[in-house]
Structures are given as structure tokens and as C-alpha cells.
Amino acid sequence: MNRMETERMYAYFLCSIPMIGGVRAGQLEERFGSPQGIYEAGVTGWRECVSESIAEYMDRQKKEDAWRQEYAQLAEKQIHLVFPWEEGFPKKLLTIPDPPYGFFYKGRLPKDTIPSVAVIGARECSDYGRYVAEELGRYLGTHRIQVISGMARGIDGISQQAALSAGGTSYGVLGCGVDICYPSQNRRLYEELGREGGLLSTYAPGIRAMPAYFPPRN
């Protein structure tokens, strides 16, 4: 394994900690020099930069060592991982206050050269809301405008399904790993997004949806 791939592997370790965003990861890198330096700092070093609970979580991840196998299985699961310093990282994400340290996806990433629209709404929507979401999704899909949403019940999923049915493309930004279908009732949409668009997440494979993970996802 060359040095670049080694650093990538250790960067994945940091991605496996769901409580660490881009800003905090950057602070850790500044303190310890590199992803491998962060890993080797251990719990004593981590306590200088993160809370006790996060340091303990990182220590458990390091001791269990399952993250190495998870990293090795990404290609087998057809899961891609891209970092801000690599070609292919979504440039628009670099403009937000806390850009992700790493970004996972299945399928494709949205194209910067094609217009995109985020459609977001209530999970428990009215009949009128459902109608508008379907019409909007169909219109965007027909006009080849990318629909980006959260694959949630209600407005999100309805608009995405309509866009796909109209021959368009859509991308689901998840509050869990891209290998997990959440909510489970959107299984058909999840599979279609993986084929016709993309499933995107800042959370590593295997990380299940938690209420605290959705605000950063949004």
C-alpha cells in the first residue's frame, strides 16, 4: 500500500466517527499533521481536541479494528469515498460552513454542469402537497433538472420518484450509511436512485439513522 492509499485508509477511520464533521477533522489534522498522525495520537491526544465521549468512541473504534475491513470492502459493496483534496469531490460542498471530511456515494454524483433543485417538505403531507410534489418532480425530471432531496417519506420521496418516472435524475442525501435504506418503506426509490442517480452520505457504511444525524445531513 503506497503512502497516499495509507493516508486514505486512516482518513476513513476518521469518517467512521459520526460525531466528527469537516471543521473538527481539520482541527485534528492541524494538531496531529495527517490522518495517520491523528490515528496514532490515541485517546490521550484526542482528548486535547474533542470531548471525552467522542475520544472514548474513537478509542473503541480503534480497539475493535473493524473499520479496516469496512474500508477494504467499499469497492465490493460498490461504495465510493471521496475527500475534499481529491478530484470528484462536489465543489459546492466546499462553500458550506462545515463541509464534510469525506463523502460516500453509490451510483453517481450530481453534475456541476447541470442545474439542480432541492425539493424538501413534510413527511406527513396533505393530498394537495402530494399533488404539487408529483407535478414539480415530473416537471424537473422532464426538463433534465437534477432533483436532490432526502429520500424521506412524504414530499421528499414523492418528488424524487416523480422525477425518475419522468426520465430525470435524482439524488438522495441520507442521514445514515449509503448501504442502509431509511426509511424502509422507500426501498423501491432507494434502489432506483442507486441505478438512475445516486445515494449520498457523509456517514460511513453501517451507521444507522439517528435523530442527531439529520440536521448535519440537511
What are these regions (language model features)?
Residues 1-142:
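Short, positively charged patches
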